[in-house]
């Protein structure tokens, strides 16, 4: 601004009443008001009339006939030029547009910036309302028009089911992108990859054959997957309700033989159940027909623990030995003789095996192959039989009849800490991530944080020794010498605000003897007992007459020893 003009502006500004120039919301409005006032009659005459003008402004009693007064966006008043006639305005506007079109893009932007700077807040609001929809772009529609369909599909593939339903209703082009991109199929595939429940349902209902295939001639249209998704959700809700209400179908395998007085351990997969019995044998059962496929013999004592993978079965016995068997042939591949008394529990994974014994020791083994197993370290510290072990890459966890849980480093085998709290010996535990869940002959279940050793919760409800326990992300399932299996809400148990009375979801009563071992997944529990039975509690395929009181109709399969 020219110095002389700036001085005149400041002089005029100082001569104005405060109610005029302080009422402006911005410098732009102030300057606008000043320029309008400068267009009035001479400053001397103007100054003589200022008192009257201020009175008019303060009372808002300005005659609408006076063209020298206008209202600013903030409500204050100032003078303005009279608008030219419509014809003159149109000519001037057309001339401005012609000049504007001749300028470069940068000059046009600079000119518009100058215009906006001279406007009031009220005008800014109008311009903002005009520009906002122009700045919004439908990129999902625009991308396919540029041959970038795959990018639009990839963006929409991150939506969850509810958002994907809404996206289909936006417009026909969005619906086409979702359909052509098979986004419902991709959503189901993502859930199957990340959620065990979805994976299990896909296998059991056999719609997995329509997934993970890229050829269009091998898969149904997108509408098939769109209609499949709510059916899957309905199945999941039904399964959850069955768990909470105790609705299930029951299948029973009778394992009685002349010398059998209990099924001490088991493990299962989709095809088979492998069990260890008190009669020194290992029996392999077909999971569909429930018929005994094979009997493995060799131990001279009860088979107390076992674990298998796709190649080998490893068993521990009261005869103090650990045996390694070929899954396919049933032949003994290796026999480990180390412990002085019964081998009570064992775990193996990723080339490492840990066994524990009634002799109070824990043995850590390097397992290069079924025939190449060497003792790495013996862990000593418990003052009674070590009943159970579990481990991961960080910790080995052991529990004993001495009422303690001990934590050891997996890599160095050095002692880390002791978890104290149970009032009597500990019979079972499971360890995963930071959580340890243990069951004891004090009839309680305890949840522990392994990193700090704190007891997070005590679950009470069993009437006798808690013999076996397993947990997943949702629930804890425990079996006890009272013959009962209890299902607990894990997430509620980890919440200190949850009342103790709400933690046990259901008690299942079907065994007539002590429950020795159990395993479960999203759809079923399989348990074994002193009553010589293996029970399969199915929460997926529930018949119409399935009961919700913990007992349900069952079909029985009897194995007769020859």
Curated annotation (Swiss-Prot):
One cellular component term from this protein's GO annotations in UniProt: cytoplasm
Record has Cytoplasm as a keyword: yes
Keywords on record: Cytoplasm, Nucleus, Repeat, Ubl conjugation pathway, WD repeat, Wnt signaling pathway
Intrachain disulfide bonds: none
Annotated segments matching region Homodimerization domain D: 87-136
The encoding gene: fbxw11a
Protein name according to UniProt: F-box and WD repeat domain-containing 11-A
Ranges: WD repeats: 256-295, 296-335, 336-375, 379-418, 419-458, 459-491, 508-538
Protein location: Cytoplasm; Nucleus
One biological process term in Gene Ontology: Wnt signaling pathway
Organism: Danio rerio
